[in-house]
Amino acid sequence: MLDPIAIQLGPLAIRWYALCIVTGLILAVYLTMKEAPRKKIIPDDILDFILVAFPLAILGARLYYVIFRFDYYSQNLGEIFAIWNGGLAIYGGLITGALVLYIFADRKLINTWDFLDIAAPSVMIAQSLGRWGNFFNQEAYGATVDNLDYLPGFIRDQMYIEGSYRQPTFLYESLWNLLGFALILIFRRKWKSLRRGHITAFYLIWYGFGRMVIEGMRTDSLMFFGLRVSQWLSVVFIGLGIMIVIYQNRKKAPYYITEEEK
């Protein structure tokens, strides 16, 4: 089993979980700022947004996690803020981040679709890296399996939990997001009929579908009417993505807008 603590500086422990999230954030900010000028967005506005959105998204992710496990946290109030032990629900962070983005874009007079389009691939790569925090914490895993011989030894050993090998669902989602990120880069360069909002829609559909399938492999999720809560949200994401495609195809606004068209 790998030590979840990456660096120990006296009483201060820096965990791999935090490093994975911060690394994903830094890469996401870099990629978003690089793409921003092509969408007529000032890169400094991206930094201003991150300074507001990131802590609120972390809070939203934690709040979502605690709410759906309130039976436990109501008896362990001291653990509610112990995010260093894990327990950040991605959907909570995404919903909070999207709300902050909408408000921020409105106040900065930035087209919301443009902001969402440049944020979507960056969020996807950040999620891909962030899932490795679950790996180090030995959480967000799936059902027991006989063996994991197809995986590298360090992953196989870390997925040996409570006397059994577990499905490395963190890895499946990480790779799924990485593939989605690569496809977005290809679409942006090669898809001539790409419309404003299409990248956002692709993210919602791609991530929603992958999460719905992978979530079905997990054993630690809350059930609601026969599906896990995250699977229901995945259905909502897919539905929103499809509606965005239909709506934006009618608008016919190209992905990159010139000043004259804007």
Swiss-Prot record:
Bilayer disposition of the protein: Multi-pass membrane protein
Keywords, A to Z, come to: Cell membrane, Membrane, Transferase, Transmembrane, Transmembrane helix
Location (main, coarse):
membrane
What is the enzyme's class at the highest EC level?
A: transferase
The record, for PROSITE patterns, names: LGT
GO-annotated biological processes:
lipoprotein biosynthetic process
Q: Name one GO molecular function term.
A: phosphatidylglycerol-prolipoprotein diacylglyceryl transferase activity
Could you tell me which InterPro entries the record lists for this protein? Lgt
- Give the record's GO CC terms: plasma membrane
Q: Transmembrane stretches, by residue range? A: 9-29, 41-61, 80-100, 109-129, 167-187, 197-217, 226-246
* Record-listed E.C. numbers: 2.5.1.145
What pathway does the UniProt record associate with this protein? Protein modification; lipoprotein biosynthesis (diacylglyceryl transfer)
Pfam families xrefs: LGT (PF01790)
Where is the protein found, in the record's own terms? Cell membrane
Chain residues that bind a 1,2-diacyl-sn-glycero-3-phospho-(1'-sn-glycerol):
R131
**PANTHER family, per the entry:** PHOSPHATIDYLGLYCEROL--PROLIPOPROTEIN DIACYLGLYCERYL TRANSFERASE, PROLIPOPROTEIN DIACYLGLYCERYL TRANSFERASE
Q: Which HAMAP family match?
A: Lgt
As for family, the record states: Belongs to the Lgt family.
Function comment: Catalyzes the transfer of the diacylglyceryl group from phosphatidylglycerol to the sulfhydryl group of the N-terminal cysteine of a prolipoprotein, the first step in the formation of mature lipoproteins.
- For this entry, the protein name equals Phosphatidylglycerol--prolipoprotein diacylglyceryl transferase
Gene source species: Streptococcus pneumoniae (strain ATCC 700669 / Spain 23F-1)
Give the encoding gene's name: lgt
